[in-house]
Structures are given as C-alpha cells and as structure tokens.
Design a protein with these regions (language model features):
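Short, small-residue-biased leader/transition segments that mark boundaries at the very start
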Residues: 1-5
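Glycine-rich ThDP/TPP pyrophosphate-binding loop and its adjacent helix/strand module
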Residues: 8-186
Length: 186
C-alpha cells in the first residue's frame, strides 16, 4: 500500500480520483463529481462509485443517493458489492439494509442485479449504464467475500486482515490454478 497510513494510493491508478473508507464519504464525493460534470456540460464524463453492503448502512450514503436522483445524475454508476459480510459480522445482523434493489429504485435509481463474479454480466451491466438517461444507475453485485481462496471464502475474519507469507502462497496457488483452468477453456 506504500505509505505509513496503509491506504490505497489514488495516484497509482489512472481514472481513480480518490479512495475513501467505509463511512460513506466516497459516494458523496462521487455525486459531487457527477453534478459538476453536468454543470460543466461534460457529457463525456462518467463517474463510478464502488460501495460495500456494510458501507451503505451509513446515513450519509442515502443522502447522497437522494441527491443523485434529484439531480438526475445519469452519468453516475453506483456499484454495490453485496457479499453479506462486514468487519463486525453479517450485515443481516449488524444493520440490515435489504431489500437494496427496491430501496434504490424507490430512491430514483435504475437498478441491475447481477452475479458479481460473472464478467459477462458485469460487462452487460456497464453497457446498460451507458445507454440510460434521466436517472443514476445502481449495479448490485451479489458476491462471495474471498471468492476463489478456500480459507477466505465467506470468512468475516478476513475482512480487514492481510495473509501471512504462507497463507499468501496458498492463496496465490489456488488463484493461479483457477486461472489456468479458465485459460484452458479459451
């Protein structure tokens, strides 16, 4: 991660203008960026915000959703990772937010619910976003936390923890084996 604060460096990935934490500030920034692009008549600008299902428990997030819908920010795509786990446990026990799709529609979003591990569905969802006008889009991705690494899958303890060297090797071996299987199918 490269610095004393162990955060993502937003300057290392082109197009990633900021990274925030789990308290929901990112979506407020994203709606501001989308509104600014509209104000400046920058029809070429698309803003993407990635949130987790634990993060959408924050009130600030829902205020930003209301703002995005009120101003018809059709240049905003909100991607919500619905894996059912957060650092404190299952989202259904900590602060249930289901049904997210109905709530997003009620807040004025177009919604698409997909398998967040299916690349074809992800591509289709983003194509859908690019063809819609008049309202923001929410792509709801049903996922499995730690997918592809046997000892991490659906384990809340891995939410904010890095693997040690031995665990890292096991994880990379498992992921590389899956990659080889996929490449053999092509």
């Amino acid at each position: 991660l490269g610095d004393v604060y162990k955060r993502q460096n937003m300057n290392s990935v082109p197009g990633v203008d900021m990274s925030t934490g789990s308290l929901g500030q990112g979506i407020s920034c994203a709606t501001g960026m989308a509104k600014a692009a509209k104000y400046l008549h920058r029809d070429d600008v698309r803003v993407y915000a990635l949130l987790g299902d634990g993060e959408i428990e924050e009130g600030e997030v829902w205020e930003a959703f209301l703002f995005a819908a009120k101003y018809k920010l059709d240049n905003l795509c909100v991607i919500i990772d619905l894996n059912g786990l957060q650092i404190d446990g299952p989202t259904s026990e900590v602060m249930p937010t289901d049904p997210v799709d109905a709530k997003m529609r009620d807040f004025g979003f177009r919604t698409v619910t997909i398998d967040g591990h299916d690349f074809a569905q992800i591509e289709d969802a983003f194509q859908y976003f690019h063809t819609q006008t008049g309202a923001p889009t929410a792509v709801l991705m049903n996922t499995t936390k730690g997918k592809g690494v046997s000892y991490m899958e659906n384990q809340v303890g891995w939410h904010g923890k890095a693997p040690n060297d031995e665990e890292y090797k096991i994880a990379m071996d498992e992921l590389n084996a899956q990659l080889a299987e996929l490449e053999a199918q092509v």
